[in-house]
């Protein structure tokens, strides 16, 4: 399979965007161990691993914590989990998500929950660079875990919802993440397949974001427009052409940036009849993928928190079990 990937490195200026070629993300985002501590979680021994991520081209340093739990039996692979928004929570924060963690560990999977530190998580100091570059370091974190922490790297499953799902999806479309994971379980979207449609597009389509969701301000922020135009938050106004161009570059299905849609990685999507219309955006990405994929839909549920509701969590567990 021929990979068609161009890494777009957004400059930190308000409007700037430079194409800097195609370096490996692992050479750009340098991951370093800061500390490790032992805890108990879910009545199991666990570790909190703090990592520093230095993105040299962006001149920023960010931090994550990884909550890692290993099964008591021989491992059958690894499950790497990421969360929505700016990724500032662990995956296991409630009854259903903790039940899913326990389920995976009981099956023999090591679990690694990524929690971005700072009030804006992966968005810390990234205003103005666009979504792909802002979440690019996800791949470097996963590769670090693969090289330094995972016992069994033959079956790596990446799983995330909403903003957690697009951390994975941008890795696949832009940064060759397929070389590092076997399966991806994407829930609650990903909601950024076509940002122009989501924000300024056809209101009649399920891929149009409804008013009042947090994605408008997040999108303004990550492009440098929060309190400097507020173009997405004020979408009733006609946006300047440069806004539409930047949103296209930031979309998973960009028309101006070459993206990879044919993967060695097996992709599984799980969505509800989402009140935020993340399912409509997710379906756009799903339909464009040219390799192995599955679509699972829960029409009677409207929650965006797919992993936190019983029907969504049960489907996630069902899928995980089939991947072993």
Q: For each predicted feature, which ranges?
A:
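C-terminal motif of bacterial Sec signal peptides marking the signal peptidase cleavage site
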Residues: 14-16
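Bacterial signal peptide processing site
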Residues: 18-20
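N-terminal cap/lid segment of alpha/beta-hydrolase-fold proteins
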Residues: 27-74
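Short, surface-exposed "cap/lid" segments of acyl-processing enzymes
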Residues: 69-103
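Conserved alpha/beta-hydrolase
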Residues: 101-122
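Alpha/beta-hydrolase active-site loop
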Residues: 127-150
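Primarily recognizes the serine-hydrolase "nucleophile elbow" in alpha/beta-hydrolase
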Residues: 153-209
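Serine-hydrolase catalytic core
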Residues: 222-315
């Amino acid at each position: 399979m021929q990979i068609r990937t161009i890494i777009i490195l957004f400059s930190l200026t308000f409007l700037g965007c430079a194409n800097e070629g195609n370096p490996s993300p692992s050479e750009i985002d340098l991951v370093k161990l800061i500390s490790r501590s032992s805890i108990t979680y879910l009545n199991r021994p666990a570790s909190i691993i703090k990592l520093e991520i230095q993105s040299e081209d962006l001149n920023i340093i960010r931090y994550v914590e990884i909550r890692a739990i290993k099964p008591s039996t021989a491992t059958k692979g690894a499950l790497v989990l990421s969360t929505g928004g700016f990724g500032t929570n662990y995956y296991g924060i409630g009854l259903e998500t903790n039940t899913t963690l326990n389920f995976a560990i009981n099956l023999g999977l090591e679990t690694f929950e990524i929690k971005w530190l700072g009030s804006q998580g992966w968005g810390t100091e990234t205003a103005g660079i666009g979504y792909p570059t802002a979440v690019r370091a996800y791949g470097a974190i996963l590769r670090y875990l693969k090289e330094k922490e995972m016992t069994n790297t033959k079956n790596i499953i990446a799983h995330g919802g909403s903003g957690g799902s697009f951390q994975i999806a941008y890795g696949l479309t832009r940064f060759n993440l397929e070389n590092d994971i076997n399966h991806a379980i994407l829930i609650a979207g990903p909601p950024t397949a076509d940002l122009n449609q989501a924000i300024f597009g056809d209101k009649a389509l399920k891929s149009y974001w409804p008013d009042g969701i947090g994605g408008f301000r997040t999108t303004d922020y990550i492009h440098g427009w929060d309190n400097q135009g507020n173009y997405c938050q004020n979408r009733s106004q006609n946006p300047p052409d440069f806004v539409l161009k930047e949103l296209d570059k930031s979309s998973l299905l960009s028309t101006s940036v070459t993206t990879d849609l044919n993967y060695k990685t097996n992709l599984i999507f799980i969505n509800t009849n989402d009140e935020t219309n993340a399912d409509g955006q997710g379906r756009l990405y799903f339909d464009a993928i040219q390799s192995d994929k599955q679509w699972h839909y829960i029409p009677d549920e409207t929650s965006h928190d797919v992993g936190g509701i019983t029907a969504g969590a049960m489907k996630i567990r069902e899928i995980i079990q089939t991947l072993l």
